[in-house]
């Protein structure tokens, strides 16, 4: 049995978020640490790779019996089948990720037009020994920005579907208690998820199974 589930959601930024982009060609006086942006629209985005990496790490930590995480190829099987495994050496089994992430574009650009979608936060570190100040400017996506989240789950084994959805939902809940992007321990990157739509393709599961999946995911937010 094979099919796909498409999950649509909104990610609302609750505190300024910084996911860094390139400043290789910044002019003199430019922001020290800009956010990553869509090349075409110039709007900030949340890269799918950032989401995938953060969710995998949080889920691995919640399952791991050790404080220090193993290499990702040594993750629990329930994590590897969701996020994939490339293998460390020739002959290792390669596991394709069942979760297919996409970059998340800014959704409420028009609402933010007057104030802008980002802000510049001025920070300063002071050396304990010499008391020398090191000022810096960090660009952040502002509180209230909403991003369009799309994810596809490949149904490779229907017997594992419910467990996979529970693990995915658990990872989302962990993220909402953690942070996305950098500088999270200083208050950056708090986010909320709101599931908008769950679409099952190919009619690969019945209505009762679909209702169960919806129940699991609706509990996220």
Where are the regions a protein language model picked out?
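RNA-binding basic/glycine-rich loop and surface signature characteristic of RAMP-family CRISPR effectors
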Residues: 1-221
């Amino acid at each position: 049995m094979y099919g796909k589930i498409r999950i649509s959601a909104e990610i609302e930024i609750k505190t300024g978020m910084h996911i860094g982009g390139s400043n290789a060609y910044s002019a003199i006086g430019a922001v020290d640490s800009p956010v990553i942006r869509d090349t075409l629209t110039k709007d900030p985005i949340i890269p799918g790779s950032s989401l995938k990496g953060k969710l995998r790490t949080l889920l691995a930590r919640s399952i791991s019996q050790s404080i220090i995480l193993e290499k990702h190829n040594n993750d629990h099987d329930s994590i590897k089948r969701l996020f994939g495994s490339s293998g460390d050496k020739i002959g290792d089994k390669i596991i394709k990720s069942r979760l297919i992430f996409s970059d998340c574009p800014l959704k409420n650009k028009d609402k933010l037009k007057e104030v802008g979608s980002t802000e510049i936060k001025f920070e300063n570190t002071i050396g304990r020994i010499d008391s020398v100040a090191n000022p810096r400017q960090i660009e952040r996506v502002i509180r209230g920005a909403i991003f369009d989240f799309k994810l596809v789950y490949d149904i490779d084994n229907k017997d594992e579907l419910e467990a996979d959805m529970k693990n995915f939902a658990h990872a989302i809940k962990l993220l909402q208690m953690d942070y996305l992007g950098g500088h999270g321990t200083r208050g950056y990157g708090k986010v909320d998820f709101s599931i908008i739509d769950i679409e099952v393709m190919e009619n690969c599961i019945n209505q009762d199974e679909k209702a169960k999946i919806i129940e699991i995911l609706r509990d996220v937010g």
